[in-house]
Amino acid sequence: MSDCSQNLLYDKFELPESVKMMAVEGSGGSVDKQASFIAEPLERGMGHTLGNALRRALLIGLEAPAIISFSMTGVLHEYMAINGIIEDVTNIILNLKGALLKKYPFQDSENGRCTQLLKSKVSIDASDLAACGGQKAVTLADLLQEGGFESVNPDYVIFTVTQPMQLDITLRVAFGRGYTTSERIVLEDKGVNEIVLDAAFSPVVLVNYFVEDTRVGQDTDFDRLILHVETDGRVSPKEALAFSTQILTKHFSIFEKMDEKKIVFEEAISLEKENKDDILHKLVLGINEIELSVRSTNCLSNANIETIGELVIMPEPRLLQFRNFGKKSLCEIKNKLKEMKLELGMDLSQFGVGLDNVKEKMKWYADKIRSKNGKG
């Protein structure tokens, strides 16, 4: 039986402070249907882990409404033609599949996620035909006369009429995920001449992700995740990403409930919270000025690391490459730096310090501090 009374302490994970959203080239700056999201830095391997999970959730997890069946005056089956309408029933069905309906089924809304019947009357007389040159297009907007559904493509043509007529049309709209074939849609109250359709519920059209290298300080062993999301306009890419994240969180929470020890992650050191002068005073300290064991001091000396600044800018894997530098010395140094509110692999670029000039810069800052204190 596991002892769950104490939390486990884990090293910090590098995480992005926020996710950056960018318009896609050629979109005119709009992010209504296409957008790219950039998250960095991530620990090595987490770019693909998150990218693949988000891609799958975006493609199969999001819900939206779609027309799952229809009936119309004079239509008995899907293989017939209708007198006075250019399109046959098969083409009308294909057009109905392209209808993009939008409605948020809020928890306290009247119908919620319930299937709805949308009934409409289409009346076309000779004057309507004359005004349109003899052919009157019936659009998606003409069929959405009730039900509270919006259409992203209201001018989308469903069929074209060539003679005066009156039609009663009923659309059955349901909420769902992904793509469902007509064979899998079961209607308990199906009408005699009601034709069931394949339904494309997902509002997400395309998802791609890419993983690139990025750096934290001098360490380049981190991931940058670039996620490209394209929707059909029923939800924005930003909404789609937010919804898919909640879906994944819901599923991961199942495994989090296992009765095991909890992990507490160490906090990353933020230089922004510290006074710049205070940080510099720590960075210019010599290695021999802090209380390290003789072994650790000698290891650093052999590696030609003389100041704290030279030490903290060094990535952890690089330290372990030095001769005789082992895990025990590494642990001691990390604990000592933590006491000083410092850590390995720090980004010192705000001080103009990099791996290529750290020795010179530490000497310059030390001279500057001594001069300021009247010890030059």
From Swiss-Prot:
Record protein name field: DNA-directed RNA polymerase subunit alpha
SUPFAM superfamilies: C-terminal domain of RNA polymerase alpha subunit, Insert subdomain of RNA polymerase alpha subunit, RBP11-like subunits of RNA polymerase
Domain of life: Bacteria
GO cellular component terms attached to this protein's record: cytoplasm; DNA-directed RNA polymerase complex
Species this chain originates from: Chlamydia abortus (strain DSM 27085 / S26/3) (Chlamydophila abortus)
HAMAP family named among the record's database cross-references: RNApol_bact_RpoA
Pfam families assigned to the protein according to its UniProt record, in alphabetical order: RNA_pol_A_bac, RNA_pol_A_CTD, RNA_pol_L
The keyword Transferase is assigned to this record: yes
Alpha N-terminal domain (alpha-NTD): region residues: 1-259
Family of the protein in this entry: Belongs to the RNA polymerase alpha chain family.
Keyword line: DNA-directed RNA polymerase, Nucleotidyltransferase, Transcription, Transferase
Listed GO MF terms: DNA binding; DNA-directed RNA polymerase activity; protein dimerization activity
InterPro entries cross-referenced by the UniProt entry: DNA-dir_RNA_pol_insert (IPR011262), DNA-dir_RNA_pol_RpoA/D/Rpb3 (IPR011263), DNA-dir_RpoA (IPR011773), RBP11-like (IPR036603), RNAP_asu_C (IPR011260), RNApol_insert_sf (IPR036643)
Catalytic activity: RNA(n) + a ribonucleoside 5'-triphosphate = RNA(n+1) + diphosphate
Subunit text: Homodimer. The RNAP catalytic core consists of 2 alpha, 1 beta, 1 beta' and 1 omega subunit. When a sigma factor is associated with the core the holoenzyme is formed, which can initiate transcription.
EC number: 2.7.7.6
One GO BP: DNA-templated transcription
Region (Alpha C-terminal domain (alpha-CTD)): 276-376
UniProt free text on domains: The N-terminal domain is essential for RNAP assembly and basal transcription, whereas the C-terminal domain is involved in interaction with transcriptional regulators and with upstream promoter elements.
Task of the protein: DNA-dependent RNA polymerase catalyzes the transcription of DNA into RNA using the four ribonucleoside triphosphates as substrates.
